Amino acid sequence: MKLEMICTGEEVLAGQIVDTNAAWFGNTMMEHGIECQRRVTVGDRLEDLVSVFKERSHEADVILVNGGLGPTSDDLSAEAMSLAKGEALVENEIWRERLENWFTRNGRVMALSNLKQAMLPESAIMIDNPVGTACGFAVKLNRAWLFFTPGVPFEFKQMVYEQFIPFVKQRFDIAGDVALRKLLTLGQGESSLADTLEQIDLPSGITIGYRSFMPHIEIKLFARGVGAIAQLDRLEAQIRFLLGNAIVACDRKSLAEEIHSLMVNSGLSLSTAESCTGGMIASQLIDLSGSSSYLDQGLVTYSNESKVRVLGVKPETLDDHGAVSIATVEEMAKGVRSILNSDFALATSGIAGPTGGTDDKPVGTVAIALATKGGVYSQMIKLPRRSRELVRSLSTAVAFDMLRRELLGEAVIVDYGSIGRFQK
């Protein structure tokens, strides 16, 4: 089965919004063993929509169309499909009744423009939208089934799960013969990783891809066919052997999600004292449901005065070593752990830039400490000076990885490679 996606909307085409629906759809399909082989974005122009529907209907088996089902003048998907099919738009009485009931139930007067959402191509199969007013539908044109969904993300996602995937599986033999495995790395550039892995003799049906999203490079293993899928475990073991410390997460988890899983399963607690990362460590964990089971409190102690007053850092430590130092960051970590009585504490202090650097401590110099019941681990790292955001995100990632390694019983301080010079 050949699956494609057509995304609609001037705002998407012009880059005014990021099309997160498309990325989510491709990833979700891959999880179900279905590969989306092409994606096209079209603006809100009737003739362009008609043209692309006709063109792609000769090439694909299934086309998911996203957007353009609302009540306004720029919602043109149903009209374009009727023109491509050469048939009239007709009112779907079931959906009209659903619309009227929805507005009555919510105590609102329905504007007549909403009736547009009940106008479907004559041969269309109505597809339920259980959480919105835009009616989905499916039409067969030439070789392809075109499946229409609203652009509102929560409506779109629910329809994909409840309507689209069952629709496809009822009509096509989906053997799940495509698999994707992801390995998240830290500290090595894309070219360095590619050079290292070039020596691997890839099994037939498997390709390696790379995706850069700082501070990480994601290695993607695509397997097509049952035989290729069976080789994934062996291939992953080879990659882990070659890359060693660079791999920090897998199974499509972010590093924060990896920490989250480990902390929840450990039953232990964590606190943070952040300076240069400005709450980024705590924020990434709080984004995940259930983090309150282990995250006691996150403090942002940005000024020297707050480090002394809140965390108990000695004034003489700051005078003798400076805020960005092993001595200071260790006292920060020990202080917050003692105050909150947590099992672990992470602390950061650094120079994120673009100003504030010196010859001894240039922009990108960051001190990180992990306090545990058994002692304190700390290191000073020198990061690329490309942007303030990069320094903060890399510092957060290294702090997370120190905690991850402690939880797994591995060496906490390691050399990641090209992200900078590390000092214990």
Swiss-Prot record:
Q: Which SUPFAM superfamilies match?
A: CinA-like, Molybdenum cofactor biosynthesis proteins
The record's annotation in InterPro entries points to: CinA, CinA-like_C, CinA_C, Competence-induced_CinA, MoaB/Mog-like_dom_sf, MoaB/Mog_dom
Q: Name one Pfam family in it.
A: MoCF_biosynth
Q: Which PANTHER family match?
A: NICOTINAMIDE-NUCLEOTIDE AMIDOHYDROLASE PNCC, NMN AMIDOHYDROLASE-LIKE PROTEIN YFAY
Task: Family membership, please give it.
Answer: Belongs to the CinA family.
According to UniProt, the name of this protein is CinA-like protein
Query: To which species is this protein native?
Result: Shewanella pealeana (strain ATCC 700345 / ANG-SQ1)
